[in-house]
Swiss-Prot record:
It comes from Mycobacterium tuberculosis (strain ATCC 25618 / H37Rv). Its cofactor is Mg(2+); Mn(2+). One of its GO terms (molecular function) is manganese ion binding. The gene is wecA. This is Decaprenyl-phosphate N-acetylglucosaminephosphotransferase. The record marks 126-127 as: Important in orienting the substrate.
Length: 404
């Protein structure tokens, strides 16, 4: 099957094809989506300053610990500013004629706001007073259950091996899969939030990739209302992350806290779930494995870095005879700092690795999967070289002020 755009060696042809996207297929409201995303960014950007002052007054401040990278007390609760941007942008989307039917015929956006409010409440309490792991986990399950109760759940699953194909999930399987993936992504984003700008940047990259994939679904299905929720959810999240990044990039003036990282995880889970639910094998064909697996690959992109870090940490600590959950300064970002990368470069390198997987999966709906895989392979080589360069040039007197 041919997708709407073909990869070509002619750069001008590819650019022209991408520009033609807005004219192909009914109901692809690119301008409205861009406006909604920009609104989320602006509200978040201007709300972050007041939230920073509020966090300082309430005592929601992260004081440096031995294993932390930051060296000065820094306010958190930045997730509140992001949530305000998201709520404002979703309200605007509900008033725009081109996006209104996404609210009338789907509960995706209202579900995200309600579940987001739950996770925001849990996160804010944790940012200020701290919560034990069990209480926090219960809050995450509650927020994920809100999504399921309001109709945001995985209904089909494509398995490309063994001739299985598309599986229609029963209610119990649908609930369990949705809860498991949602809580996993929420915790993955919470786990990776260890460097200035890292979680916000990963949220931005992955949300843009999901939005790109959702726009492709809208184009291919003539503006089917089922594909509005993932497009709106992802572009709103991308805008909120973009608006927060100027305050959070190294050296950060404010941290997003658990309220922010868990909110990003919840919305990414909701966006990928609403993107995956309506996809039909009849629409794309069994051989288009990349397109059918893209929602899962986008989930993998979010979880790739934190899960790799977590697995390495468990192996490292158990081999040393310590608890698998005992803290240390040997996380992936610590190692990248130690080999000679600056704080900013570590963040940018992780952006690159996640972006390769995220945009590689999302672009499968526009480009030939074989060409996409070839480009991804080349990008992986480039990312690998960029990661290892300090080992080749580093001397005993190597120094970078950003490491301080």
């Amino acid at each position: 099957m041919q997708y709407g755009l073909e990869v070509s060696s002619d750069v001008a042809g590819v650019a022209g094809g991408l520009l033609a996207l807005s004219y192909r297929g009914a109901g692809v409201p690119l301008r409205e989506l861009a406006l909604v995303g920009l609104t989320a960014a602006i509200i978040t950007y201007f709300a972050t300053g007041p939230v920073r002052m509020l966090a300082s007054r309430l005592g929601a401040v992260a004081y440096p610990r031995e294993r932390d990278v930051h060296v000065t007390p820094t306010p958190r609760m930045g997730g509140l500013a992001m949530f305000l941007g998201i709520v404002g942008a979703v309200f605007l989307a509900s008033q725009l004629p081109a996006l209104t039917r996404g609210f009338v015929y789907s509960t995706g956006m209202p579900a995200v706001l309600v579940a987001g409010a739950v996770i925001m409440g849990i996160g804010l309490i944790d940012d200020r007073w701290g919560l034990d792991a069990l209480t926090k986990f219960a809050g995450q399950i509650t927020a994920a259950s809100v999504l399921v109760t309001m109709g945001v759940a995985w209904s089909v699953l494509y398995i490309p091996v063994g001739g299985v194909g598309t599986i229609v999930l029963d209610q119990a399987s649908s609930i369990l899969l949705t809860l498991a993936l949602t809580v996993s992504i929420v915790n993955a984003m919470n786990f990776v939030d260890g460097l200035d700008g890292l979680a916000a940047g990963l949220g931005l990259i992955t949300a843009l990739a999901i939005c790109m994939f959702s726009v492709g679904l809208l184009r291919d299905h003539g503006g089917d209302v089922l594909y509005y929720p993932p497009a709106v959810i992802s572009v709103v999240l991308a805008g909120a992350c973009l608006g927060f990044l100027p305050h959070n990039f190294h050296r950060a003036k404010i941290f997003m806290g658990d309220s922010g990282s868990m909110l990003i995880g919840l919305m990414l889970a909701a966006a990928s779930t609403t993107a995956a639910g309506p996809i039909s094998q009849n629409a794309y064909g069994a051989r288009d494995v990349f397109a059918l697996l893209s929602p899962f690959l986008l989930v993998v992109a979010v979880m790739f870095v934190p899960m790799l870090d977590l697995l390495l940490a468990i192996v490292r600590r158990t081999r040393a005879g310590r608890s698998a959950f005992s803290p240390d300064k040997m996380h992936l970002h610590h190692r990248l700092l130690q080999i000679g990368h600056s704080h900013r470069r570590v963040v940018l390198i992780i952006y690159l690795w996640v972006g390769i997987v995220a945009f590689g999966a999302a672009s499968s709906i526009f480009f030939n999967p074989r060409d996409t895989a070839a480009v991804m392979l080349g990008a992986i080589v480039v990312a690998g070289v960029a990661t290892l360069i300090p080992l080749l040039r580093r001397g005993d007197d190597y120094y970078d002020p950003d490491l301080d």
